[in-house]
Swiss-Prot record:
GO cellular component: cytoplasm
Function: Responsible for the release of ribosomes from messenger RNA at the termination of protein biosynthesis. May increase the efficiency of translation by recycling ribosomes from one round of translation to another.
Taxonomic source organism: Prochlorococcus marinus (strain MIT 9312)
Superkingdom, taxonomy of origin: Bacteria
Descriptive protein name: Ribosome-recycling factor
Location relative to the cell: Cytoplasm
UniProt family annotation: Belongs to the RRF family.
Biological processes, Gene Ontology terms: translational termination
GO terms assigned for molecular function: ribosomal large subunit binding
Length: 182
C-alpha cells in the first residue's frame, strides 16, 4: 500500500469516529444529535435531515420543521423511541426538543460511549496498519522489495498509525471535556 492510500483510509476512520462522537449528547442542543435517527416514511427508513429543516434555536432547544406536515407524527415518534432520552414537543407545524442538562450519571455513560467509539476507531486504524504491513511482507516474500525496504516501510506505517491514534485520543479527550462541562 502506498503511504498516501494508508493515510486516506485512516482519515476515513477518523471521520467515522468523529461522526460517532457528534451523535453523543453533551447537554447542549446540537442538530447532529438527530443524525442517526431514521423515520418510517412511505414504507422506507429515511433520515430526519432528509425530511425536515433542523436548527438550534438556543443552547437548549432544537427546532425541526418538516417539509411535509404529514410526516410530523412519524418524526415525533422516531425521536421519542430513540435512545437519546429527549421528549419532542409537537405544536402541529414544528417539533421542538428541549435538551435538558445531563445528570452526572448520564455524563459518565456518555463518556464511556465516547471511549467505546474511540476504541472502535483505533481498531479500524490497526486493521488498516495490519493490511499494509501484510502487503509489505508479501512484497518482500515475492522478492519485489528488499528486507531493508520492507522494514523501513513497516516502520513508516507504524509512525503513521501512531499519529492517527494520537489524533483519536485528542478528539476523545476534547469530547469528554465537552460532555463533562456543566
Amino acid at each position: 500500500m502506498k503511504e498516501q492510500e494508508i493515510q486516506e483510509n485512516m482519515n476515513k476512520s477518523i471521520e467515522a469516529t468523529q461522526r460517532n462522537f457528534n451523535t453523543i449528547r453533551t447537554g447542549r442542543a446540537n442538530a447532529s444529535l438527530l443524525d442517526r435517527i431514521s423515520v418510517e416514511y412511505y414504507g422506507a427508513e429515511t433520515p430526519i435531515k432528509s425530511l425536515a429543516t433542523i436548527s438550534t434555536v438556543d443552547s437548549q432547544t432544537i427546532s425541526i420543521q418538516p417539509f411535509d406536515i404529514s410526516c410530523l407524527q412519524a418524526i415525533e415518534k422516531s425521536i421519542s423511541m430513540s435512545d437519546l432520552g429527549i421528549t419532542p414537543n409537537n405544536d402541529g407545524k414544528v417539533i421542538r426538543i428541549n435538551v435538558p442538562p445531563l445528570t452526572e450519571e448520564r455524563r459518565k455513560e456518555f463518556c464511556k460511549l465516547a471511549s467505546k467509539y474511540a476504541e472502535e476507531g483505533k481498531v479500524a486504524l490497526r486493521n488498516i496498519r495490519r493490511d499494509a504491513v501484510d502487503k509489505e511482507k508479501k512484497d518482500e516474500k515475492d522478492g519485489l522489495i528488499s528486507i531493508d525496504e520492507s522494514r523501513d516501510n513497516q516502520s513508516e506505517i507504524q509512525k503513521i498509525t501512531n499519529k492517527f491514534i494520537a489524533l483519536i485520543e485528542t478528539k476523545l479527550s476534547e469530547k469528554e471535556k465537552e460532555i463533562l462541562k456543566v
